[in-house]
Amino acid sequence: MAPISLSDIISALPSEDSWGPSTTSETTLNGVPYAPYSKGDKLGRMADWTAEGKDGRDGRGGRQQYNRNYRDQQVYGAGTSSLFAVQLAEDESTFSVVSNTRDSTKTRFGRGGLARGRGQRGGRGDTRGGRGQFQRVGGRGGQQGYNSYDTRGGRGGARGGRKFGWKDYDKPQRNRDASVNIKPDWKMLEEIDFNRLAKLNLDTDDGEDIDSYGFLYYYDRSFDKQPVKAAERKLNVVDRASYNVTTSSDPVIQELAEKDEATIFATDSILSMLMCSPRSVYPWDIVIVRQGNKVFLDKRDNATLDMVTVNENAADAPMDASEGSKDAINQPSALAEEATYINHNFANQVMKESDSQKVEMENENPFYNSAEETDPPASKAYKYRKFDLSLNDEDPVHLVVRTELDAVSKNAISGEDQFLTVKALNEFDSKAQGSGGALDWRTKLVSQRGAVVATEMKNNSCKLARWTVQSIIAKADVMKLGFVSRANPKLNDRHVVLGVIGWKPRDFASQMNLSLSNGWGIVRTIVDMCLKREEGKYVLVKDPNKPILRLYQVPAGSFEDDGEHDVIEENVEEDD
């Protein structure tokens, strides 16, 4: 081939000033260069070095995989690699959807459950103090008026429910009912989220005793021994008169209020719920009555506050079962009634009942009336204790709380009497939904006691925190925790005691990362909200589905249909 000279190359160059192919009228549209195309044409770049080759990353796949994964993506508008598509900052081509649809379906059920307990919880005293007539807790009667903790709709088609899909993890799956019906004439004053409550702090002293009532039996140490598998201890029904009277109906608190002993009055059950509120999940409510410069923390009759919850803090908490389902005994309301029944009978069973060996308090039981009660009183000591919640000396604020002790025991070393609180954890079915990954107590309680307790701390954080707070403010030396399981996981009317473990309350609180200073700060904050407002009645409500507390101002006659909270008002009218 003859060589080409430089002059020939220069002469072959186009003579126009512009570079590139010459523009003709056939390739222009209104004078603008235009290339006709259809949306079915394959469009791409001259050289795209960022795309994968036809052989794939690992050299395998071949032409068929190339056509399926690469070539067809270049169709106009077909994928993210189109020239006309918006290029995102992050590549989402590798995103995949994982279905979280569950096979089992749950539907809403009609409320029902275990028939336990002797009548209603709470009660009211005589209008002028004294013993009056009080309703008892525990026993065998029916418990009425209990609101279900979890009242979700159906899940998955059987009752009009819907299937779960993408991002359902981010949607509320359990819509619980509020513990009290919010009426239109209630005025919301404050809304506090739990994050704000967790930052509160108030240091206070250990408190001082004002007076004590009742008596205590000695604790039966044989329950501390590990039972033989062939001879497990059965949980027996022990009928004893026990009371859970609200604050304003307590004749002793009425007398202390008339003497201006304190600004705030409460019971240990109500106070512990308020102090441990950031750990709560289920709904609850506290009635707050401001009378003059005094604040009474009360509860309603049949309130969920008195029920012992089960696995409230578990990641997969117990759910409602369908009507007629075999899992109906494992729904939240039935488990709560079962746990309340177990705690009442367990505390009575572990006592050595002997009139010659018991510790008498300074005064008799203020709620027991031998002329009306057929059952003997339960081993119970009521200590009225006073705490200083003042921020400075110029503005003193004190709190009087009625605390409870369950038993007394001799110290193994010094031989001195130690005061005990007795509670019970219950196992329903380690394999059922809502068990929270709990271990089998029958096989693991002895060999892996630490793991069993750690799991209970996780699944029942609020319940254990409340028991610990009640033990500390009562100045109990030891908190006994019994481990009670069903004799048959499918039946909730027979139980066995698998063991009892004792802790010092403050040591147990440190293991749970429980701060009493935070609890006292919450109490002082809520009380200050009521003290800065006018006299009247307020209700503190835990939102059933959100970690929020709401303070409502309610009419003065609210809840009086239930026969409660009118004791103070009647006393004031008589004084006038």
Curated annotation (Swiss-Prot):
It is found in: Cytoplasm. GO terms for molecular function: mRNA cap binding; translation initiation factor activity. Disulfide bonds: none annotated. One of its GO terms (biological process) is cap-dependent translational initiation. GO terms for cellular component: cytosol; eukaryotic 43S preinitiation complex; eukaryotic 48S preinitiation complex; eukaryotic translation initiation factor 3 complex, eIF3e; eukaryotic translation initiation factor 3 complex, eIF3m. The keyword RNA-binding applies. Residues 304-318 are annotated as: RNA gate. Residues 165-176 have a biased composition (Basic and acidic residues). It holds the Pfam family eIF-3_zeta. Residues 110-122 have a biased composition (Gly residues). Keywords: Cytoplasm, Initiation factor, Protein biosynthesis, RNA-binding. Residues 103-176 are annotated as: Disordered. It comes from the Eukaryota. The keyword Metal-binding does not apply. InterPro entries: eIF3d. mRNA cap-binding component of the eukaryotic translation initiation factor 3 (eIF-3) complex, which is involved in protein synthesis of a specialized repertoire of mRNAs and, together with other initiation factors, stimulates binding of mRNA and methionyl-tRNAi to the 40S ribosome. The eIF-3 complex specifically targets and initiates translation of a subset of mRNAs involved in cell proliferation. In the eIF-3 complex, eif3d specifically recognizes and binds the 7-methylguanosine cap of a subset of mRNAs. The RNA gate region regulates mRNA cap recognition to prevent promiscuous mRNA-binding before assembly of eif3d into the full eukaryotic translation initiation factor 3 (eIF-3) complex. Belongs to the eIF-3 subunit D family. Component of the eukaryotic translation initiation factor 3 (eIF-3) complex. This is Eukaryotic translation initiation factor 3 subunit D. It comes from Botryotinia fuckeliana (strain B05.10).
